[in-house]
Each structure stands twice: as C-alpha cells, then as structure tokens.
A protein has these predicted regions:
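Conserved phosphate-binding/catalytic region of the ribokinase-like
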Residues: 3, 51-161
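Conserved beta-alpha-beta core of the PfkB/ribokinase-like small-molecule kinase fold
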Residues: 1-60, 77-79
C-alpha cells in the first residue's frame, strides 16, 4: 500500500503484559515497520523496537527500514520528526497537565488528519503536538478531544503555527 501512495502509519502502544514473549516484540516490530509510510513511537517504545536510545539514531534506523517519516515522541522535550531530508525537534506546547490519558490518541488522530490534508511532516507534527497538549490540559480524555479550531487556537496562542 505504501508503494502505491497510501499513507500507512504504525503507532504502537507497548504493553509487555499482552505479549506471550515480550522478547519477540523487536523482530515483529521491525517486520511491520517496513510496510508503513510513517512510524510513530515514544522514546521508550523505539528503544525496544530498534535498540537505540538516542532519538536521532533511532529515527535513522526507522527510516532505513522503509518508512518516509519517523516520529519519536519525547514527552516534555517535544517531538522528533525525521525524513530523508533531515530531522528537527518540534518543541512542546506548555500547558498545565491535568490528565495524560488520551494524549497519544489525540496526537495520532491529529497527525493522520494533517498528513491526509497534505501538510508537510513538521507542520503535521506541530498540529498533532498541540492536539495532545489540548487533551492533557483537561480532565476527561474523550470529551477533551479537540476540534481543528481548538488546535489552531492553541497553536496561535503558543506562537507555533
């Protein structure tokens, strides 16, 4: 599908208790990564998947496996976005954290939304980062999922458009 131009994204949620043999995860992750056009990971997940702790090195390994976009979420340090043209860290949007539940879901959905809209990877990640920030600043994760207007407002307030 990726080779036909479809956008396919792997955004795994590492839960070792769900694996009969957690040691098998890296091999299975690597097999799947080669089929996606974008890989999205947290720093901890990417280290499990490719054996690299440093985000830039991990992104290089991811890109070598085939995806055109590697995203490594760095928590309070922002998000690394990497393509064959280079890498940059999109800074975090500072909000008061109320509840972290749902932030990854908001990030993933917003990233898909903006990539499908044709945004360049860094712009899509900035938008996704703001969507995640919007959710963590609220109590109920499902009710906190932002509209596009709310994300754009937060980006504008942060000076991050």
């Amino acid at each position: 599908m990726r080779d036909a131009g479809a956008i396919t994204i792997i955004d795994l949620d590492w839960r070792p208790v769900l694996w009969a043999d957690p040691a098998a995860a890296p091999e299975r992750y690597r097999a799947a990564m080669g089929h996606a056009s974008a890989d999205v990971w947290t720093r901890a997940e990417v280290e499990i998947a490719v054996g690299e702790h440093e985000p830039e090195a991990a992104a290089a390994v991811l890109l070598a496996l085939g995806p055109r976009l590697a995203v490594v979420k760095l928590g309070g340090e922002g998000v690394l976005v990497a393509t064959e043209d280079g890498a940059e860290v999109v800074p975090p949007i500072r909000v008061e954290v109320v509840n972290g539940l749902g932030a990854g879901d908001a990030f993933g959905g917003a990233l898909c939304h903006r990539l499908l809209a044709g945004d360049d990877p860094a712009a899509a990640v900035r938008f996704a980062n703001a969507a995640g920030a919007h959710v963590v600043a609220r109590l109920a994760c499902a009710d906190a999922m932002p509209t596009e207007a709310e994300v754009l407002e937060l980006l504008g307030a942060a000076g991050a458009r």
